[in-house]
Amino acid sequence: MTRTYYISALAGILTAFMLQGCYKVSPHGYKELAQITINATSDTINVNLGTELVYNGLDIVSSKETTFQWAYGQVKTGTVPEQHQFEKMEVISTSRTINYTFSKVGSFLLRLRVDNGESIEFKYFTLNVNSGYDEGVAILSNDGDGNGSLTFVKTLTAEESAKGEQHVFTNIFSVEGKTLKNGTSLYISDNTYSKITYSGFLIGTNDEDGTIYHMDCKTFELYMTAKMKDFGSYCEEFGGEYAEDKASFGCFFKSADGRLFRYDMNGGFISEITDAPFKITRIFDGTTKGTSTTAKSTRYPLFYDSSTIGIRKSASAGIRTNSEEGWEIVNAGAQRVSSNAYIHVLFRSKSDPTSYKTKVTSSSLSAWATKTEEINGESVKMDVEYPFTTASLKMDSHSKILGNRVSSDVYYTYDNAIYRWSLTSAPGNNPAIKLPAGEQIRDIATNFKGRKASDGEDRLYVATYNPSRSGDHKGSLYVYRYSDDTLVASYEGICDDPSSVIYKYRIN
């Protein structure tokens, strides 16, 4: 039997964790209650599915004999792990150690209760029961004949790193009777409604059926498939959802011929959004960050053509649009450090191609944001906009704009380089990140950790293709740090020609 062991280190270098009990000392001579101190080697415990966890990583100090209880369960819906609330607890040990084999993949809250008859202390852990592909970077790529592969660069746990375990898997797509062909786009999401989780890792393709693969987020096993051939097209790009604890949970995507579709994560069916007022040029998810600890990041579907930007926030609200007469849309991006869903749209004048301006939506996204200024002694209400002129804009409609939770700037791609943009000024002339010579940028992503995750989205992933690279695989992954644009890691020659890259975050 395979076992995972956790052994206590020296007490002098351990992290102490103690919750104060009811210790009473009075001038009248009341007895002081016997204290308990719990020291643990780590606040996170990792174990693989089906592997027995043998945990001995504790130092407990008590002057009296102690009893123990270990219990685990999922974090209560609507709370965060730091609040230490369970949906339901299961006791797995009543001894000092754990000897237990878990049968369910996911991230759980683990609680230790220590009682010496006078005091009770608690220690909480994050318990990760891993499937093997729990967290990391997924790259969808195709060779010259359209044969697809799903490469996975695994984010290793501390224990896996110490053991030097493998973390690059060239192709993890394995579905009996299915061949991945002409992969186009990736998407991942999870939503819980009435204690039912709707989740999925989606793969869009341009195969003969226009297949969309709905994979299990924990194991990459096939859950179901849907076909776009009945609509005469295929999924070109995923982009957004409306899933704020609503039963009508779905992911939106753009077809190759510019139509808007929705994939239902529960039923697995595809429906066309027929009230879309125009053919779509691009689609992206407008992600915004909530301010409270339990707020979710909402990824609304945003899409635009040459003159109008649209959003569908919910099934009942329909599609809202904004445009600007006499101007055409160059590109658009979402501001992510605000609690509101502000979208910045870059326009170019139809009469003067050197004249540009950025306009901002209101927090409801239903109109342009406005401001009031004093002009000739009168208060005048006007739209918020940031004009500038340039004869050589380093951005076009093919540039992918990507925001993050830790910076008011966005990254975007142009001419095989990465630029930063504040969204309230002219885009820069000099790239923030230059890729190695010969690398052609195919897609970028951040380590977005999911709708309920805390902050910490601090990495940029760049999938590239170099036709001159030696060897069979000419696709690579470069990882950069947001804070200073420095290279963190590179994985060269690990895939074919990438079409999509995404961070596969941990999902329960």
Q: Locations of the language-model features?
A:
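Bacterial N-terminal signal peptides that target proteins for export
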Residues: 1-10
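Acidic/polar, low-complexity intrinsically disordered N-terminal segments immediately downstream
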Residues: 4, 23-178, 452-457, 465-508
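C-terminal motif of bacterial Sec signal peptides marking the signal peptidase cleavage site
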Residues: 18-21
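Entry beta-strands of beta-propeller and related beta-repeat scaffolds
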Residues: 133-139, 199-202, 251, 343-345, ...
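Short, solvent-exposed loop/turn segments at conserved positions within beta-propeller repeat blades
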Residues: 143-148, 196-197, 206-209, 218, ...
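Hydrophobic core register within WD40 beta-propeller blades
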Residues: 150, 186, 191, 332, ...
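Acidic, serine/threonine- and glycine-rich low-complexity intrinsically disordered segments
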Residues: 210-417, 421-422
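Conserved blade-ending motifs and adjacent loop-strand segments that build the rim/top face
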Residues: 384-397, 429-453, 486-500
